[in-house]
């Protein structure tokens, strides 16, 4: 079976008393196990989109890979994020300066059947001139894809939110490093 991979990463400044990171974590904790049906996945991703739409996104990265490398790309994104979360030292108690410069990183990845209506949605919505790939407007458009997908044609999906509870997230310098590979959006 041939697939297409779609991945989006967005980062926004972690602000004291801003509930967004907590709301994302609560959504994942509450709905992660119970979103196996097509309808449940549709509702879940609609809620993820609704939360991320309110985020003041500063950095981002995205990719659409169709064909032979799609499944490898999905697995690579997932394993790199999972291994970084597992090996990232606990940053609890870090300095106030670190906390004030910390970001929340949200990543969404999808593996869809090649040629399906979900794949066509990705093709239509990701047909963006290269000069516009890294703008806030483009990322708003990319996030809006989540609730549009027909999850009957989505073979795998995942969402990650870093940092976890009581931890500082990556800094702007870390986000643009080769480890993260994000770009400051225009």
What are these regions (language model features)?
Residues 46, 66-67, 164, 168:
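Charge-rich, low-complexity amphipathic helices
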């Amino acid at each position: 079976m041939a697939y297409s991979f779609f991945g989006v990463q967005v980062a926004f400044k972690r602000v004291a008393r801003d509930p967004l990171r907590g709301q994302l974590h609560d959504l994942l904790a509450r709905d992660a196990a119970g979103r196996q049906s097509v309808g449940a996945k549709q509702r879940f991703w609609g809620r993820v989109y609704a939360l991320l739409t309110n985020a003041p996104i500063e950095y981002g990265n995205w990719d659409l890979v169709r064909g032979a490398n799609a499944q490898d790309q999905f697995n690579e994104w997932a394993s790199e994020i999972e291994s970084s979360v597992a090996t990232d030292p606990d940053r609890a108690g870090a300095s106030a300066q670190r906390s004030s410069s910390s970001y929340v990183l949200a990543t969404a990845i999808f593996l869809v059947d090649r040629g399906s209506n979900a794949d066509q949605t990705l093709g239509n919505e990701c047909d963006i001139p290269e000069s516009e790939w890294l703008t806030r407007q483009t990322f708003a458009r990319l996030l809006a894809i989540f609730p549009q997908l027909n999850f009957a044609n989505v073979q795998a999906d995942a969402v990650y939110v870093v940092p976890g509870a009581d931890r500082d997230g990556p800094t702007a310098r870390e986000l643009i490093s080769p480890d993260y590979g994000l770009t400051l959006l225009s």
